[in-house]
Design a protein with these regions (language model features):
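Acidic/polar loop patches that form or flank catalytic/metal-binding clefts of enzymes
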Residues: 48-53, 134-135, 194-196
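Long, highly charged amphipathic alpha-helices
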Residues: 37-38, 181, 202
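Small/polar glycine-rich anion-binding or flexible loop at a beta-alpha turn
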Residues: 57-59, 197-203
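Catalytic-core segments of enzymes that bind and process phosphorylated/nucleotide-bearing substrates
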Residues: 81, 85-101, 142-196
């Protein structure tokens, strides 16, 4: 309940829909706090992300909550992940790369501006070491006028990735991605070099 802060697992009139995550048994206790920090970093970088909350619980436990963006007025909002849109198996590292992400974004949204948004997400993931960047962690959502666009960023946090590699590579590189490779990716996104440079420096 946004008025009282009370919550329930049952669908209740007047309540907002949120997802609440707890650390898995094999995860460090601070993973929820780290994801909250990353959510704040996304906002500081001007990247759209859902409202979030961090809960410090008894016995050293914690939880991270994010408001669902696939719900509006109690109804489902059409959404599809990059994996669903392309038919890619997100469990296979390297099945898609960031160029595929840009091109899929252009195909799904029919809006070149959304490719620039997708490029910005790539920059953040590289700069902030989010290597859990598989195709299920990007999505497209339908606006009220029926237009597809990139969803808010979600499941963004520090992740070492499989053997230190990003799940999606940038211009063939998935381990040590350089500024030069990011600028080449910007060309694919039709982002001018000077604009891309400012985006990289800003993040």
């Amino acid at each position: 309940d946004p008025e009282t802060g009370r919550f329930t697992t049952a669908v209740t009139a007047g309540f907002e829909a949120w997802l609440v995550k707890f650390p898995a048994k094999e995860e460090h206790a601070e993973v929820c706090a780290i994801e909250m920090v990353y959510a704040e970093c996304l906002r500081m970088c001007g990247i759209e992300t859902p409202d979030t909350q961090y809960f410090s619980l008894p016995n050293g436990l914690a939880a991270f909550a994010s408001k669902r963006f696939d719900r509006r007025d109690g109804l489902r909002v059409p959404m599809q992940s990059l994996a669903a849109f392309t038919g890619a198996n997100y469990r296979s590292p390297g099945v898609l790369d960031y160029v595929n992400f840009l091109r899929a974004t252009q195909m799904c949204t029919n809006d070149v501006r959304e490719m620039a948004v997708a490029f910005e997400r790539a920059v953040f993931n590289v700069a902030f070491n989010n290597r859990d960047d598989h195709p299920k962690n990007f999505a497209y959502i339908m606006s009220q006028d029926g237009q597809w666009r990139l969803s808010p960023a979600y499941d963004v946090t520090f992740c070492e990735g499989p053997s230190g590699y990003h799940q999606m590579d940038v211009m063939g590189e998935a381990l040590s991605i350089s500024r030069t490779q990011m600028l080449r990716l910007a060309e694919e996104a039709e982002v001018p070099p000077d604009v891309a440079g400012r985006m990289i420096d800003g993040i």
